[in-house]
Amino acid sequence: MSIHHLARANVLALEPYLSARRLGGQGNIWLNANEYPLPPGYGLRGGNLNRYPACQPAGVINGYAAYAGVQPEQVVVCRGADEGIELLIRAFCEPGADAILFCPPTYGMYSVSAETFGIARRTVEARQDWQLDLQAIRARLDGVKLVYICSPNNPTGNLIDLETLRAMLEMTHGRALLVVDEAYIDFCPQASVVNWLAEYPHLVILRTLSKAFALAGLRCGFVLANVEVIQLLLKVIAPYPLALPVADIAEQALSDEGLRQMRTRVAEINTNRETLAHGLADCPCICAVYPSVSNYLLVRCDPAYRVFKTLWDQGTILRDQSKQPGLADCLRITIGTLAECQSVIAVLRALKPSSSKESL
């Protein structure tokens, strides 16, 4: 006997977010999830696993507040920035009444999280330069409680212009929260809007330890906001969101030595990104390599499925973005080690475009 008649209708209709791990693959070079390619060297410092953890462990909160340049009371730590996306929806959106707004092509969890909670989704596609269409957004703001903007944007890799973000804050004042997803900001920290929190009470920032901190497996993220927002989020967060081992390693990552290691990784990845970008520009099967300030590159291929399968068959796994608006024949390539980048370049230099007579 099926139990589907007991399930919520919107969950039955839900198309789940397909993470890199759910999509799977058999490879030895994983360039599909924007992870750091090598594990960091943190170890557990042990103890007291018989006790429940603190809801908001002081060492983690204080460490991240100091790193981000905010007060501890402006920080919530959660199970990845994905949980931050959900906490905001749970705290601010009424199912069946309110909506969120986002601007594809962008990160898929804004849509999935809203649909899971029965919140309407409004989209305003980005312009051809992947900047925001302010006029179109203004026309769709009625009933919107949360606007999610990813900067640097995943998967395109570009920053949203600061003047555009400021215009969005003025536009949403008194109407909605503007949530700036800065999951990749550690690769370009000068572009953060964290210093604007004092000026805009409706600004919210999402952060993570998954990217530059090389801790994707830890599932540790942060919401930065003004105290009034933080207090509401603490009403709906789980009582023990961070396991003791997670808090232990996160605190180590936010130490002076942990921050030094993170900045070394950022410099390495930024250098490897330029190496990969220059190498791909010379590959006949690559039509465009788009500028990026993050730990991945978006490339347009001739055609994407052939480039994807060629690398897949050789054990290198990328992320196909072709179904996103405006990204036909586009693949996203995570920046790996120098050797991994050179391997991708070597394979693709030998691959002719489908339009080439030599490839027939």
UniProtKB/Swiss-Prot annotation:
PROSITE patterns: AA_TRANSFER_CLASS_2 (PS00599). It catalyses: L-histidinol phosphate + 2-oxoglutarate = 3-(imidazol-4-yl)-2-oxopropyl phosphate + L-glutamate. The keyword Transferase applies. Its cofactor is pyridoxal 5'-phosphate. The keyword Amino-acid biosynthesis applies. The modification N6-(pyridoxal phosphate)lysine is found at K211. Gene3D superfamilies: Aspartate Aminotransferase, domain 1, Type I PLP-dependent aspartate aminotransferase-like (Major domain). Its EC number is 2.6.1.9. Keywords: Amino-acid biosynthesis, Aminotransferase, Histidine biosynthesis, Pyridoxal phosphate, Transferase. It holds the Pfam family Aminotran_1_2. One of its GO terms (molecular function) is pyridoxal phosphate binding. GO terms for biological process: L-histidine biosynthetic process. Pathway: Amino-acid biosynthesis; L-histidine biosynthesis; L-histidine from 5-phospho-alpha-D-ribose 1-diphosphate: step 7/9. InterPro entries: Aminotrans_II_pyridoxalP_BS, Aminotransferase_I/II_large, HisP_aminotrans, PyrdxlP-dep_Trfase, PyrdxlP-dep_Trfase_major, PyrdxlP-dep_Trfase_small. Belongs to the class-II pyridoxal-phosphate-dependent aminotransferase family. Histidinol-phosphate aminotransferase subfamily. Homodimer. This is Histidinol-phosphate aminotransferase.
